[in-house]
């Protein structure tokens, strides 16, 4: 701040130095003027000027230091009171601009909230004809057409589900209900949802659960597992998906393993990025690159570590590592 102040008041300092030098120069040229009193006057005035600068530094930088340290939360009450006319101009400008930004942010927040409510209402409304469509598809006798329609229905269902949860994620922490969740029950419910699709593709499930209860939020855990299971089914054919749970180093670990095509090593670091789809095959399958991204976002507030390992041509394993119960309770302040 001192360097900034000196730079700002550089013109003052230069003019004082010039005037002092000019005074000495005039005294030097005029022999009638004794130099000793002139030097004394120059020294004394220089000391007074330095004292003046020190006082002005403390007085002027208080406002700007507070401004520099101001927490950008649009709360102008934390600003130091303006004293000089120029400081008051700055203060008035900040207050005016802050008020404008607060009003704009409020309007934007209200619009987003309205958009979210409208979209959620629309998604809930569309689920009724979607359920009726599923019942109609189940009554079809042509297995080929039934299989094709089931797959397309499942795509619509999962995309709507992703949109529903994507809009809820920003408010997720206000929506958490942490309890003992029966892992087997959640898995059976999600597998049942994918049943028609799995039958079409000849896919079964092998549950090897050493641990059946986890401390988490049931609906958000269901969403994470739904993304992992649908991803496994999508890229597998005529094989089993193995789901294991066990305790490793005091933490519950759940693994979802498929024996599909696997993921290229170069794609693994980006698999959880928003909108990332690895190959052209993904595009023909209608991948949006949102499922795993949303699963990762949901896992973070739940303190679940979501990791992936894969071998091309052999399959993929997604691993969910749950926190220790006491660590989870302490972090969430339960």
From Swiss-Prot:
It is an enzyme of class 2 (transferase). GO terms for biological process: cellular response to phosphate starvation. It is found in: Cell membrane. It is a multi-pass membrane protein. GO terms for molecular function: ATP binding; phosphoprotein phosphatase activity; phosphorelay sensor kinase activity. SMART domains: HATPase_c. The chain crosses the membrane at residues 13-33, 35-55. Residues 121-326 form the Histidine kinase domain. Coiled coil: none annotated. It holds the Pfam family HATPase_c. Its EC number is 2.7.13.3. InterPro entries: 2-comp_sensor_kinase, HATPase_C_sf, His_kinase_dom, HisK_dim/P_dom, HisK_dim/P_sf, Sig_transdc_His_kin-like_C. One of its GO terms (cellular component) is plasma membrane. Keywords: ATP-binding, Cell membrane, Kinase, Membrane, Nucleotide-binding, Phosphoprotein, Transferase, Transmembrane, Transmembrane helix, Two-component regulatory system. It catalyses: ATP + protein L-histidine = ADP + protein N-phospho-L-histidine. SUPFAM superfamilies: ATPase domain of HSP90 chaperone/DNA topoisomerase II/histidine kinase (SSF55874), Homodimeric domain of signal transducing histidine kinase (SSF47384). Member of the two-component regulatory system BceS/BceR involved in the regulation of bacitracin resistance. Activates BceR in response to extracellular bacitracin. This is Sensor protein BceS. It comes from Halalkalibacterium halodurans (strain ATCC BAA-125 / DSM 18197 / FERM 7344 / JCM 9153 / C-125) (Bacillus halodurans). The lineage of its organism: Bacteria, Bacillati, Bacillota, Bacilli, Bacillales. The gene is bceS.
